[in-house]
C-alpha cells in the first residue's frame, strides 16, 4: 500500500490543497533543518503572513533531525524508530475546521483507509480538554481514551505564541510480544505506539504565561510515514518495513553478510544515513567543515565507520544511492535528476575518510586499553583534527563499550587550536581564504567603499598581496590591492564585482575578505605600498549591473504579488548582461503566470519611480515593511531601498529611477531544488539584444518554412506530418502470417518496417483469441513486442524470455509488453523459443 499517496489523496478529497515537501534547509534562521511538517507553515501559525486560500493544506514533509536542538543521530540504529531522515504526513487547517473534523478525519483514515483494527487503537487527550474527550467518544469507547497533563498532551511552538492541547492516537502492538513493566498506556514501553498527533492550536501564550483564546484556532497534525508503514505491515521495527529492507538487502548483498535484527545495528545506521545523505545533497547541502555541511559529513562518516565494522574497506555508500532513488524517486523526482551528482559527491567523501579511518581506529583501540571510564579528550581531539573523526563518532564508538569521552578536555584543545589558527579566524566577508587578513585589520581597520557616490577617486594603497594573499611591499605580478578608499563594489548579495583600473593596472575582480574590500589586478607596472593612485570603475558595466539589480527587486515584488507572500528570495546572481533570481515556490510557473510577472515588472519600470535610499536600524526597517532575507546577517544600521512598491534591505548599487531599467524580459524559468524555482531575465541593452536574437530566429524560421506567415507554415507542416504518420500506420497493417492452434491465432515473426504496436493491436482486434510476438531491427537496435488476448499466457513473461536470449531485458503488462535486445545473431533462436513456449502453454 502506498500510504504516502493514500494520505494525500484522502485529505485532498476533504478539500485540502496538497503542498509539496518544502526544502530541508528552511527559510528560518532559528532552525538548522526542517524538522517537522508544520515548519513550512510556521509564519502562518504565528500570524506573520495571512491565512492561505484555501485554508486547508496537506503534505508529506521530508525532515532531518540531526544536529541542533532536535538531534536523533546518536540513537539511530539502536532503537526501532529513531531516524535522522523521515517523512511527516500532516493535515493543516488555518482558521477553518477544528477539533470535531480533525478527529473525524483522523479516525476515518486510520480505520477505513489504513484499516487498522479498532480494538488495537487508543487515544490520549489533555486532562482539561473535555471537548476533545467528548468528541472522541463518537468514535471510540470511553475506556480507550486516556487523559494526561501538559508534559504529554500540550504543544507550543516556543515560550510565547500559538499553542494548545493535543490528542494522540496509539496502536497496541500486542501484549504477547512485550513483557516490560512499562508496557501500558502512558508508560515508556514499546507495546503502545503513538502513530498520530493532532494539535489543537487554540491559544496564544503571552510573555507572562497567560493563555488567551485565538479568534480563529488552527489544526496541525503529524504522523510519521516510517512508523505507520511498519504498523501497517505488521513489523515491530521501522527498519523491517518496505521503506528500509530494500536498502538493508542491498547492504547485505554488498558485504556478503546476512542481516539479523539483534546484531544488525550497523545495517540500520547505514540504511538510515544513506537516505539523509541523498536528500541533503539533492537539496544543495554539500560536505563542509561547519554548519549544515558538517552535519552531513558527520552523518556519512558515522555510516562509513559502521560499514568498516561490516568489512567495507573501499567506498560503498555511493552504490546505495540507486536503491534509495528507486524507492523514493517516484515521489521526489528531483532525486533521479541529481542521482549521478549525488553518487559522485558521496564517493569522493568516502575516499577522503577511508584514507584515514584505519589509522584512526588503531589509535582509538590503543587508547581504549588505557581507558577505564572516560576516554581521553586529547586523543579524541587528535582523532578529529588529524583523522577526521567527528566527536560524536568517537562517542558512538565508546557507547558500544559503555564508556564516555572527556568532552570538556576535547573542547579545551579545540579552543586552543582556534586561537592559534588564522584560518579559523572568522569575519563577515562573502568569501573565505587563508591569508594575512587579520594583520591588515589590526593595522588599518576596514577600508572604505565610496562607490555609492563616486565612480573614481584618488586613493592611497594601504597594502598589496600576492595571489596567495601574502603581504608584499611592491607588486608587478597579478595580485590584490587594498585601497584606503575604493570605488570598486565587491561581490556581495548576489551582485557581481566592479571592474576598471587602479593606475594603469586593470581590475579584474573585487572581493570581500573579513570586511576588507580587495581588488584583484592584472600584472603590469610596479605598484608600491603608500602610493597615491587613481582608481576608476567601468561605469558602463556598473550601470548595466545596477539596472539588472534593481530589476531583481521589482521581480521579487511581482512574484510575491502574483504567486503569494510565501515567495522569498533563495539566491540571486546579478551581472551586467543578465540576472538570475531563485525563490521559494512549490511548483513550476505556467505560461500565464510568467506573462503576468513580466508584464507587472515592465509596468513598474514604466511608472518611473524614483529610487529612495535610507539608512536605519534593522528593527525600524522591518517595521517599515522592508523585506529582509533569512540567509543574510545584518548588523547595526541597514540600507533600505524603495523602488515604487518594492522595499527591501540591500547594500548593492541601483538605478536612480526605474525608467532607467528599460525593458524586462524573462528568458527562462526552471527548478533549482524542491520548493525553489529560478527565473533568468535580461534588461536594458541585454534585453534589446535578446529581442534582436529572437527576431533573427523568427526570420530563419520563415526562411525554413518558406512562408512569411509562421503559424500558417507550422500548421501546414503539421498536416504533412500527420499525413505521413497515417501512411506509416496504414503500411503497418500488412497481413501477418499466422497459424491456429486450438482456436488461438498465433503469429511469431521478424518484421522490417511499420509501427510494431499498431500491428500487434490490429492483429489482436481481428481474433477472439490471439498471441503475437514481433521482433524488429532498426539501426542495429532490436525491439521486441508481444500481445496476448484471452489466452492463459503473459505478454511480459513471453517478451522477457525472448529478450534475454538477445542479451536484453524488458517486460510490461499481461496483455502487452515490450523489450530490447542486442545480439542480432540470435533472432531466429529467440523466435523459435517463443513459438515453443506459446505452443507448450496451449
From Swiss-Prot:
Its main location: cytoplasm. PANTHER family: ALANINE--TRNA LIGASE, CYTOPLASMIC (PTHR11777:SF9), ALANYL-TRNA SYNTHETASE (PTHR11777). This is Alanine--tRNA ligase. The keyword Ligase applies. Catalyzes the attachment of alanine to tRNA(Ala) in a two-step reaction: alanine is first activated by ATP to form Ala-AMP and then transferred to the acceptor end of tRNA(Ala). Also edits incorrectly charged Ser-tRNA(Ala) and Gly-tRNA(Ala) via its editing domain. The gene is alaS. Belongs to the class-II aminoacyl-tRNA synthetase family. Keywords: Aminoacyl-tRNA synthetase, ATP-binding, Cytoplasm, Ligase, Metal-binding, Nucleotide-binding, Protein biosynthesis, RNA-binding, tRNA-binding, Zinc. Coiled coil: none annotated. It catalyses: tRNA(Ala) + L-alanine + ATP = L-alanyl-tRNA(Ala) + AMP + diphosphate. Pfam families: DHHA1, tRNA-synt_2c, tRNA_SAD. It comes from Campylobacter jejuni subsp. jejuni serotype O:2 (strain ATCC 700819 / NCTC 11168). Consists of three domains; the N-terminal catalytic domain, the editing domain and the C-terminal C-Ala domain. The editing domain removes incorrectly charged amino acids, while the C-Ala domain, along with tRNA(Ala), serves as a bridge to cooperatively bring together the editing and aminoacylation centers thus stimulating deacylation of misacylated tRNAs. One of its GO terms (cellular component) is cytosol. InterPro entries: aa-tRNA-synth_II/BPL/LPL (IPR045864), Ala-tRNA-lgiase_IIc (IPR002318), Ala-tRNA-ligase_IIc_anticod-bd (IPR018162), Ala-tRNA-synth_IIc_core (IPR018165), Ala-tRNA-synth_IIc_N (IPR018164), Ala-tRNA_ligase (IPR050058), Ala_tRNA_ligase_euk/bac (IPR023033), DHHA1_dom (IPR003156). Its EC number is 6.1.1.7. Its cofactor is Zn(2+). It is found in: Cytoplasm. The keyword Protein biosynthesis applies. Zn(2+) binds at residues 549, 553, 650, 654. One of its GO terms (biological process) is alanyl-tRNA aminoacylation.
Amino acid at each position: 500500500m502506498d500510504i504516502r499517496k493514500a494520505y494525500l489523496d484522502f485529505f485532498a478529497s476533504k478539500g485540502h490543497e496538497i503542498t509539496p515537501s518544502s526544502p530541508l534547509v528552511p527559510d528560518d534562521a532559528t532552525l538548522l533543518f526542517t524538522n517537522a511538517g508544520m515548519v513550512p507553515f510556521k509564519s502562518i501559525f504565528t500570524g506573520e503572513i495571512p491565512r492561505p486560500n484555501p485554508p486547508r493544506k496537506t503534505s508529506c514533509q521530508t525532515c532531518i533531525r540531526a544536529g541542533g536542538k532536535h538531534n536523533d543521530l546518536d540513537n539511530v540504529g539502536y532503537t526501532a524508530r529513531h531516524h535522522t531522515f523521515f517523512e511527516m504526513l500532516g493535515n493543516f487547517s488555518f482558521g477553518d475546521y477544528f477539533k470535531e473534523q480533525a478527529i473525524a478525519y483522523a479516525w476515518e483514515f486510520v480505520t477505513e483507509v489504513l484499516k487498522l483494527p479498532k480494538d488495537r487503537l487508543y487515544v490520549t487527550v489533555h486532562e482539561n480538554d473535555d471537548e476533545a474527550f467528548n468528541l472522541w467518544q463518537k468514535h471510540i469507547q470511553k475506556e480507550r481514551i486516556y487523559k494526561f497533563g501538559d508534559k504529554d498532551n500540550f504543544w507550543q511552538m516556543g515560550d510565547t505564541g500559538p499553542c494548545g492541547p493535543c490528542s494522540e492516537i496509539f496502536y497496541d502492538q500486542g501484549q504477547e510480544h512485550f513483557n516490560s513493566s512499562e508496557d501500558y498506556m502512558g508508560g515508556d514501553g514499546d507495546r503502545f505506539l503513538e502513530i498520530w498527533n493532532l494539535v489543537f492550536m487554540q491559544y496564544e501564550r503571552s510573555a507572562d504565561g497567560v493563555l488567551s483564546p485565538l479568534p480563529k484556532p488552527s489544526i496541525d497534525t503529524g504522523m510519521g510515514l516510517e512508523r505507520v508503514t511498519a504498523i501497517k505491515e505488521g513489523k515491530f521495527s521501522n527498519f523491517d518495513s518496505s521503506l528500509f529492507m530494500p536498502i538493508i538487502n542491498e547492504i547485505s548483498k554488498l558485504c556478503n553478510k546476512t542481516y539479523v535484527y539483534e546484531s544488525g545495528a550497523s545495517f540500520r545506521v547505514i540504511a538510515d544515513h544513506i537516505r539523509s545523505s541523498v536528500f541533503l545533497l539533492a537539496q544543495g547541502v554539500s560536505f563542509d567543515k561547519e554548519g549544515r555541511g558538517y552535519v552531513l559529513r558527520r552523518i556519512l562518516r558515522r555510516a562509513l565507520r559502521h560499514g568498516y565494522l561490516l568489512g567495507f574497506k573501499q567506498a560503498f555508500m555511493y552504490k546505495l544511492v540507486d536503491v534509495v532513488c528507486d524507492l523514493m524517486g517516484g515521489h521526489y523526482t528531483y532525486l533521479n535528476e541529481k542521482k549521478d551528482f549525488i553518487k559522485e559527491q558521496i564517493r569522493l567523501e568516502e575516499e577522503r575518510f577511508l584514507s584515514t579511518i584505519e589509522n584512526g581506529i588503531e589509535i582509538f583501540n590503543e587508547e581504549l586499553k588505557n581507558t577505564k571510564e572516560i576516554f581521553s579528550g586529547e586523543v579524541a581531539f587528535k582523532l578529529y583534527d588529524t583523522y577526521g573523526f567527528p566527536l560524536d563518532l568517537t562517542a558512538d564508538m565508546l557507547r558500544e563499550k559503555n564508556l564516555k569521552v572527556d568532552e570538556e578536555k576535547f573542547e579545551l584543545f579545540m579552543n586552543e587550536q582556534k586561537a592559534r589558527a588564522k584560518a579559523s579566524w572568522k569575519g563577515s566577508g562573502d568569501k573565505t581564504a587563508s591569508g594575512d587578513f587579520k594583520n591588515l585589520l589590526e593595522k588599518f581597520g576596514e577600508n572604505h567603499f565610496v562607490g555609492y557616490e563616486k565612480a573614481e577617486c584618488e586613493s592611497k594603497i594601504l597594502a598589496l598581496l600576492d595571489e596567495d594573499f601574502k603581504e608584499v611591499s611592491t607588486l608587478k605580478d597579478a595580485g590584490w590591492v587594498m585601497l584606503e578608499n575604493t570605488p570598486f563594489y565587491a561581490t556581495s548579495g548576489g551582485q557581481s564585482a566592479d571592474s576598471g583600473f587602479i593606475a594603469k593596472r586593470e581590475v579584474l575582480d573585487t572581493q570581500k575578505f573579513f570586511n576588507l574590500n580587495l581588488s584583484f589586478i592584472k600584472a603590469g607596472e610596479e605598484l608600491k605600498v603608500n602610493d597615491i593612485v587613481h582608481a576608476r570603475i567601468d561605469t558602463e558595466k556598473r550601470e548595466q549591473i545596477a539596472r539588472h539589480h534593481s530589476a531583481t527587486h521589482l521581480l521579487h515584488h511581482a512574484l510575491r504579488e502574483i504567486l503569494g507572500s510565501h515567495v522569498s528570495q533563495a539566491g540571486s546572481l546579478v551581472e551586467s548582461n543578465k540576472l538570475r533570481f531563485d525563490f521559494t515556490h512549490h511548483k513550476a510557473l505556467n505560461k500565464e503566470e510568467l506573462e503576468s510577472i513580466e508584464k507587472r515588472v515592465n509596468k513598474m519600470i514604466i511608472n518611473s519611480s524614483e529610487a529612495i535610499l535610507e539608512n536605519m536600524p534593522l528593527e525600524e526597517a522591518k517595521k517599515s515593511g522592508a523585506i529582509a532575507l533569512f540567509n543574510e546577517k545584518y548588523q547595526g544600521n541597514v540600507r533600505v531601498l524603495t523602488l515604487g512598491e518594492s522595499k527591501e534591505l540591500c547594500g548593492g548599487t541601483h538605478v536612480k529611477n526605474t525608467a532607467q531599467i528599460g525593458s524586462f524580459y524573462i528568458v527562462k524559468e526552471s527548478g533549482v531544488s524542491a520548493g525553489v524555482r529560478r527565473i533568468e531575465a535580461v534588461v536594458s541593452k541585454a534585453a534589446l539584444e535578446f529581442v534582436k536574437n529572437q527576431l533573427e530566429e523568427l526570420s530563419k524560421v520563415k526562411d525554413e518554412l518558406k512562408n512569411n506567415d509562421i503559424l500558417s507554415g507550422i500548421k501546414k507542416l503539421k498536416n504533412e506530418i500527420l499525413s505521413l504518420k497515417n501512411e506509416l500506420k496504414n503500411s503497418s497493417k500488412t497481413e501477418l502470417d499466422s497459424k491456429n492452434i486450438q482456436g488461438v491465432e498465433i503469429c511469431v515473426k521478424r518484421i522490417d518496417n511499420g509501427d510494431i504496436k499498431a500491428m500487434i493491436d490490429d492483429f489482436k482486434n481481428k481474433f477472439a483469441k490471439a498471441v503475437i510476438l514481433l521482433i524488429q531491427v532498426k539501426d542495429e537496435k532490436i525491439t521486441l513486442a508481444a500481445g496476448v488476448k484471452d489466452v492463459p499466457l503473459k505478454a511480459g513473461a513471453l517478451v522477457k524470455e525472448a529478450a534475454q536470449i538477445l542479451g536484453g531485458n524488458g517486460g510490461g503488462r499481461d496483455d502487452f509488453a515490450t523489450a530490447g535486445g542486442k545480439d542480432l545473431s540470435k533472432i531466429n533462436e529467440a523466435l523459435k523459443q517463443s513459438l515453443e513456449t506459446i505452443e507448450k502453454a496451449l
